[in-house]
């Protein structure tokens, strides 16, 4: 299996789920991709510049991008850093999954988060290529084997859910709830709207999430 380029955020109570707020359920939240300002600037000089170990600006800190972003959000929740625009997405998701019953910090301490696409894009309107998605598949399986989630919650249908790999996948209804079979265990996966979508409603999404996940 291929190691992920962007290491996942793993909440402390995901690691020790016995008394977590989801009744012991280990939830993997699957996002889409990262935006990289460094890549944006590189593209001004070299249109072929691409995210990864071969990027001329690669540093080992690139691998902790996902974890660093989540930690920055948690620091904001603690009053330790200033607000940034992306934090609205993380807050809206936390409110959707908890129905406003828990703080965003509590939610993020109880879940794992991983962006499926393992190659950042240079700005928010740019989309990963089909090659980028394909090359992210093996790392996704590696994450499932290592984190052993009980359920996967996808942020978005077209960009995330529909680009996850078909190997080991079964979808009885052909649309929403299906499952991966990894090491003999079935891992259900479903999707909600991406919380960055302007029309995202935590109340509406909570109704869908509550069919599969309950806050205790």
Question: Which sequence ranges carry the predicted segments?
Answer:
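Short, solvent-exposed loop/turn segments at secondary-structure junctions
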Residues: 32-37, 117-121, 157-161, 194-198
